[in-house]
Amino acid sequence: MLNADHLHVARDGRAILNDLSIRIAPGCVTALLGRNGAGKSTLLGVLAGDLPAGGLARGATVRGGVALNGEPLHAIDAPRLARLRAVLPQASRPAFAFSAREIVLLGRYPHARRAGALTHADGEIASQALALAGATALDARDVTTLSGGELARVQFARVLAQLWPPPGAAQPPRYLLLDEPTAALDLAHQHQLLDTVRRLSRDWNLGVLTIVHDPNLAARHADRIAMLADGAIVAQGAPADVLRPEPIARCYGFRVRLVDAGDGVAPVIVPA
């Protein structure tokens, strides 16, 4: 379990997260919804260890507790933490002309037995991760020439390579934290990526927290929904329980209605 308890985050005297608690369970995809500026990326940063709880971090005051598999997050050293959780931040374009394969291989360095010494097996994992991300054709491409959507798929392959399970070894639960992974993707690739995330959450026993802006995507691909507004979780639970007009209006300040899609999976959320 990756859990945060009673988080308070403030920056420049302004509260960003206020007494927030959340649990990310292995084998489960949790979608985090909220309007722009609600604190979603801040929460993900705290859970990732980029904003450590218990003091000042990057100009923010952070209070509260975060634990990963029962261990305080701040007590886990960086190499071990990198093997237990992977983070896909919002889109950022590399400044150097790495190939897509070289970017994906960055995810394997936490597993190297000697600094910088990757193996043939790491290369095989990179190839499989690119295939899972639908990015095999981009293998040799210079990442500075890729479109936003192509780069997003390569970076997704990188975090898959980072959490790739070793053969025959029991693994502690691991966690995948995704910040708007579908923002640059077309319709088909949005659903393909989230389908892959949900399948791997079960096959690899991953706890997943993904920030998404489209509640319709969350309804179809998440096991649980957490809605964030004014620095607090205002609703959380199964999609059918949470994605209703009243909680959505509270989360987004926007009235919606539900339309039967006719497929028995989830209703479509449209403006009221």
UniProtKB/Swiss-Prot annotation:
Q: Which GO terms describe its molecular function?
A: ATP binding; ATP hydrolysis activity
Instruction: State the annotated membrane topology for this chain.
Output: Peripheral membrane protein
Its localization reads:
Cell inner membrane
Q: Give the top-level enzyme category.
A: translocase
- Annotated residues for binding of ATP: 34-41
**Short name of one Pfam family:** ABC_tran
Q: Which residues are in the ABC transporter domain?
A: 2-255
The main location class comes to membrane
Q: Which PROSITE patterns match?
A: ABC_TRANSPORTER_1 (PS00211), ABC_TRANSPORTER_2 (PS50893), HMUV (PS51261)
Instruction: Name any GO cellular component annotation.
Output: plasma membrane
SMART domains tied to this protein: AAA
Which key words are in the record?
Answer: ATP-binding, Cell inner membrane, Cell membrane, Membrane, Nucleotide-binding, Translocase, Transport
Enzyme Commission identifier(s): 7.6.2.-
Report the protein's function. Answer: Part of the ABC transporter complex HmuTUV involved in hemin import. Responsible for energy coupling to the transport system.
Family that this chain belongs to: Belongs to the ABC transporter superfamily. Heme (hemin) importer (TC 3.A.1.14.5) family.
Assembly description: The complex is composed of two ATP-binding proteins (HmuV), two transmembrane proteins (HmuU) and a solute-binding protein (HmuT).
List the protein's name: Hemin import ATP-binding protein HmuV
